[in-house]
Amino acid sequence: MILVLVVMTIHWRQKKEMQITTVLRPSVKETNSFYTSNRQPLQPLSFIKLPVGNIKPGGWIKKYLELQRDGLTGHLNEISAWLDKNNNAWYSVDNKGDHGWEEVPYWLKGYGDLAYLLHDDKMIAETKSWLEKVIRSQRPDGFFGPDKFTGPASTVANNDNPKGLIDLWPNMIMLWCLQSYYEYSSDHRVIDLMERYFKWESKVPDSSFLESYWENSRGGDNLYSIYWLYNITGESWLLDLAKKVHGNTADWTQKNNLPNWHNVNVAQCFREPATYYMQTKDSFYLQASYNDFNLIRSIYGQVPGGMFGADENAREGYTDPRQGVETCGMVEEMASDEIMLRITGDPFWADHCEEVAFNTYPAAVMPDFKSLRYITSPNMAVSDSLNHSPGIENSGPYLMMNPFSSRCCQHNHTQGWPYYAENMWMATPDNGLVAMLYNSSDVTAKVGGGETVTLREETHYPFENTVKIKVIAAHSSKFPLYLRVPAWCDSASIRVNDVALKFASTPSSYVRIENEWKNGDYISIVLPMKIQTTRWPKNKNSVSINYGPLTFSLKIKEEYKKADSRQGALEEAKWQPSADPAKWPAYEIIPETAWNYGIPEKELNKINLSETFQVKRKSWPKNDFPFENSSTPIYIVTNGKKLPLWKIDKYGLCDTLPPSPVITKTSLEQIELIPMGAARLRISAFPVIK
């Protein structure tokens, strides 16, 4: 059971009473009157997702979404052969074709939500053209989608699918696409399709249900969709199906072990027990998800950036920060964090989502969002077209930025920022709202007694520490507004209409302000940031430098070498004949300055770290995009020393970290650090110099 812990309550009077409470979790004794939450007997949700479209992004997140629209996400259907509508099993009238597996729903999952967030009519129409085919594909027995898949798991027996059974994994993704469409459109055909499909699933014998590798690992996504439908229809047979799905899914509740160590599976599937916990209310399942999260990181995640080393699979002995993770893994981790946050209310998951979103995911794509790479690492001195195996697990050009390549990540990247934007605000069980992932936006929602309000948030967070919120409302409304205090912040301050509030500023908490809010009210939140260091004893005692939610990398001058996307593509890549490599080039990124620096121990041991790690600021970028090496609005100046023996190794990667403390006779130099999300070549885990 999630306990509600009230730290202190203070009453403060303006014209009417305002109640201010610091809580570690929201109370779930009430049920939100306006937005779909968990029905009985499911465990009540701590926070409730608002329908897509209720949040209008602004500031840098809007710019990022526009870059997606104008870049790879918005135009991948012109490039990828898997998205070609000709003879596509997802688009055909008879559910047959020579291609059609996970790629279409992967792409559509983020493409559609991006369309709804930006209210882009052209993209919405394109989304609907696919979903109309999906809805019409449903057979009389309830199954929908391609009759057979041509992917790694198909109706043809292979290593992943030895029995040659129909693979349900692609349908799991498409169900999420349909749910977003229903949120946006209220098209009841989605509910009808899901009911009939789940009745079909109910009839599949356990002996042939969720048998192949991907669907077996990722059955939690199927489980999530069952609960989504149950919360709308209340049909009790769906809870029986949920038990069946959980029982036939890989066991993510093992103690000190995982069913497999594939990076995307771990990032995506560790949430499965917590999802099932909503039905059982048995804390064993909730704790299992926390255990899975901690287990992978205790061995392979002793690195900055929030992820772990599994450049396909986590491998014994490959724990250095030069090991990377797939772009797929990053966006699935963000989605898992958002779901865990709604289930548990634990602000840890918001902190972690930001850690990945700000520090790891931006570096996986080009600044113009027209290309991406398969693998990104916390320490990455080169991003080229060479084969780096076995330094990384797979053979091939996995480090190159290439819009024609990286089949799974090429399509699955789309969900990252749209899902983040949809979770910036959430509804609360007591008919309020929570500012969860701070970013510029307008949220319009029903609150209190049913009044509709808009809250306009303006901020440059995480590059600045101030967040401003303005109330826009036709009528006053009494409702609670929750403001998250991150774990790294120990002295948050809040003002309402220029009056400072008195409250207990507690890291990893929420400040709940219940008030009669009226048009023109404004709230100002200041989240003071300070330099903090993280030591990694399990990774050669290296160190990383943090400022608020941002982790910093050595600034390495990056040379971008344009290349033909066809020449540097992975062997499995396929593109449409009309795809123009001149319009969509690939890039190698080569360092033009030294990358092999360490930080002297004496710099780290000073009482006042701000003296040796001086935070500097530049003007906000005119294009509203802060994740670029040359234009990031914040940087740190400190001292470092070159380590001549730390070089590129025989696999073409930066060598593993030397054990700290390191002895070197090189001269002390002034070095510049930038947010690691803006560094596509990066050193973010530094050796410590004696």
For every predicted segment, state its role.
Residues 100-116, 166-182, 215-231, 262-278, ...:
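Well-ordered alpha-helical segments within folded domains of soluble proteins
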Residues 77-98, 145-166, 216-231, 258-276, ...:
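Carbohydrate-binding/catalytic loop surfaces
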Residues 15-103, 124, 128-150, 188:
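Low-complexity, Ser/Thr/Pro/Gly-enriched N-terminal "stalk/linker" regions
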Residues 45-57, 115-128, 181-195, 230-243, ...:
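Structural helix-adjacent loops and short alpha-helical linkers that scaffold large soluble proteins
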Residues 18, 23-30, 289, 350-359, ...:
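C-terminal beta-rich recognition modules with glycine/proline-rich loops and embedded aromatic residues
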Residues 489-515, 533-538:
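Solvent-exposed beta-strand/loop surfaces of large extracellular or lumenal domains
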Residues 26, 60-91, 126-143, 192-209, ...:
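Long, well-ordered core segments of solenoidal/helical folds
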Residues 93-97, 115-245, 255:
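Extended ligand-binding groove/face enriched in aromatic
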